[in-house]
From Swiss-Prot:
The keyword Repressor does not apply. This is Tetraacyldisaccharide 4'-kinase. ATP binds at T54, V55, G56, G57, A58, G59, K60, T61. Its EC number is 2.7.1.130. Pathway: Glycolipid biosynthesis; lipid IV(A) biosynthesis; lipid IV(A) from (3R)-3-hydroxytetradecanoyl-[acyl-carrier-protein] and UDP-N-acetyl-alpha-D-glucosamine: step 6/6. It catalyses: a lipid A disaccharide + ATP = a lipid IVA + ADP + H(+). InterPro entries: LpxK, P-loop_NTPase. The keyword Zinc does not apply. Disulfide bonds: none annotated. Belongs to the LpxK family. GO terms for molecular function: ATP binding; tetraacyldisaccharide 4'-kinase activity. GO terms for cellular component: plasma membrane. The gene is lpxK.
């Protein structure tokens, strides 16, 4: 099964994008107007929003983790607000990585909770206030840029360098969550992750709008176990090709790949199929940290499968060594100005 985003979204506009243009115009009018006119409620903590222009994977999770680590290194106590995509909690919930499963809270919150307290709620203000009651002094909003349900002191929009914003059309004709011009007006800075020229257009738009542009790479953090081996790599994330490339960067030979939908809930037949395919070709099985979190909390996954499954985690590294600290400083300074202004 492929990603939830239709493949044509990431190609040049074709007849499908043209046929869906009227629906996209309506969607864009509504989403753009909501974004521009919104006056989100505020909390008495500095808030950094890590979002993206499109649906699908761009690198928000490793970016949020990098900022959580950076805040901790400065002596701060960050908390992360998330909607918990893929989970089924409808109220306020503090993620417990030792007991919660991905089916209940989502895979990304489980990963994030390894680094900072994560509060799930459709009411982002309530989640932020709850984290404040736990002693958190810095809020990272995982996604939520377009919903405008919590004021952000700084909105960092993440884009994948190879895919960019796809065909540049709004849902359902393309992957944009709202018209790019409307989103750019509310963007404080752009973070381009990886190598490639797919994001050249959005980078030019950000430059014309006077927005700072940062660059970063995803570096494999466990290369020693990957290098020199032949792999069947599988992933259920927004942009699986990025993961396969990371395996190659870590020195692994990717012989076979198998892509599932983003946040995919694996079935026993899926696991048997992967094991059989790997066994026939003498390959090791490797997946992402996000997929491993889902698999490890599913009741039907055999322990022996998990014990043999390799996991490639990645860390975000800014090209400019002072970039992360500069953004954190800006968030705090804007919060202080808001508080005393």
């Amino acid at each position: 099964m492929a990603s939830e985003a239709p493949p044509f979204w990431w190609d040049e506009p074709d007849w499908r994008a043209l046929a869906l243009a009227p629906a996209a115009w309506i969607y864009g009018r509504v989403s753009g107007r909501r974004l521009i006119r919104a006056v989100p409620p505020r909390v008495s903590l500095p808030v950094l929003c890590v979002g993206n222009f499109t649906v699908g994977g761009a690198g928000k999770t490793p970016t949020a983790i990098a900022f959580a680590r950076g805040a901790i290194a400065r002596g701060m106590k960050p908390g992360i607000v998330s909607r918990g995509y893929g989970g089924n909690y409808s109220g306020l919930h503090l993620v417990d990585p030792g007991h919660d499963g991905a089916r209940h809270v989502g895979d990304e919150p489980l990963l994030l909770a390894r680094h900072a307290a994560v509060a799930l709620s459709p009411d982002r203000v309530k989640a932020a206030e709850y984290l404040k009651s736990l002693g958190c002094d810095f809020i990272i909003m995982d996604d939520g840029f377009q919903s405008a349900r919590l004021h952000a002191d700084f909105s960092l929009l993440v884009v994948d360098a190879s895919r960019g914003i796809g065909n540049g059309r709004v849902i359902p004709a393309g992957p944009l969550r709202a018209p790019l011009t409307d989103q750019m007006r509310k963007t404080d800075a752009l973070l381009c992750i990886g190598k490639g020229n797919g994001a050249d257009f959005v980078i030019r738009q950000a430059a014309r709008a006077g927005r700072p542009i940062y660059h970063a790479q995803l570096r494999p953090s466990s290369s020693a176990t990957v290098a020199g081996r032949r792999w069947l790599a599988f992933a259920g994330i927004g942009n699986p090709d990025k993961f396969y490339e990371s395996v190659r960067q870590a020195g692994g030979e990717v012989v076979e790949t198998h892509s599932f939908a983003d946040h995919y809930s694996f079935e026993p037949d899926d696991i048997r199929g992967l094991v059989d395919m790997a066994r026939r070709q003498g390959l090791g099985l490797i997946t992402t940290a996000k997929d491993h979190v889902r698999l490890a909390t599913m009741p039907d996954v055999p322990p022996e499968f998990l014990s043999k499954l390799a996991v490639l985690d990645v860390d975000l590294e800014f090209d400019r060594t002072d970039a992360l600290d500069h953004i954190l400083d800006t968030v705090v300074e804007r919060f202080k100005s808001r508080l005393h202004g």
